[in-house]
């Protein structure tokens, strides 16, 4: 808030603060009880994951991007996993190539999405824990972004062992 106030004074214009994102980093993974089966997504899953990504972007109001290319690329790299319960996909999560930052390897978990009809069953926790292990397995510190105003996702990530390390806010001038 201090930075936003200073920008308003400097520019002499009001600034509209938009929804923020919280940045979490994993301390110690606390694995949830398992249910169902987790598998890496394949090209055969493209349509479903593409639809879920569109839904994810609508719900989270993140900036739009080339969803088709991103989904195809991440499926090809083996970066997207599906959770299936009784053979039906119920949730997915992805991760990104780790990057070197200040001498440390940092890997980002996300996106994580469970359609509304499958929520409140622990599926997001389970798929997030699985993908987190993939990031850690690459020798990276696991991080993720979540909406500041979404208490459910924040609670899930904290229960898995993620701790808040920073916050980003988007602004409009």
Regions picked out by a protein language model, each given a short descriptive name:
Residues 1-35:
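Acyl-donor-binding surface of acyltransferase catalytic domains
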Residues 1-3, 143-154, 158, 170-173:
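Conserved beta-strand-loop-alpha-helix junction that forms the acyl-donor binding cleft
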Residues 78, 139-141:
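Short, high-confidence coil segments that cap the C-terminus of an alpha-helix
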Residues 29-63:
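Short amphipathic alpha-helix that is part of the acyltransferase structural core
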Residues 11-18, 158-167:
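Conserved acetyl-CoA-binding loop of GNAT-fold acetyltransferases
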Residues 111-116, 120-137, 154-159:
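Conserved acetyl-CoA-binding loop-helix of GNAT-fold acetyltransferases
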Residues 19-23, 78, 166-169:
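Short hydrophobic/aromatic beta-strand or adjacent loop that forms the aromatic wall/cage
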Residues 63, 69-113:
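A conserved beta-strand-loop-helix scaffold within acyl/acetyltransferase catalytic domains
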């Amino acid at each position: 808030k201090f930075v936003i106030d200073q920008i308003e004074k400097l520019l002499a214009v009001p600034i509209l603060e938009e929804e923020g994102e919280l940045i979490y980093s994993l301390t110690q993974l606390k694995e949830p009880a398992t249910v169902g089966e987790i598998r890496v997504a394949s090209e055969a899953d493209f349509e479903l994951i593409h639809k879920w990504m569109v839904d994810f972007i609508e719900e989270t109001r993140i900036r739009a991007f080339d969803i088709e290319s991103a989904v195809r690329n991440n499926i090809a790299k083996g970066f997207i996993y599906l959770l299936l319960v009784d053979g039906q996909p119920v949730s997915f999560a992805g991760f990104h190539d780790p990057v070197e930052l200040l001498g440390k390897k940092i890997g980002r978990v996300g996106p994580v999405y469970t359609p509304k009809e499958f929520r409140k069953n622990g599926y997001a926790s389970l798929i997030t824990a699985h993908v987190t292990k993939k990031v850690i397995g690459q020798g990276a510190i696991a991080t993720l972004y979540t909406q500041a105003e979404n208490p459910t996702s924040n609670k899930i990530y904290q229960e898995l062992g993620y701790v808040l390390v920073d916050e980003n806010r988007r602004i409009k001038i």
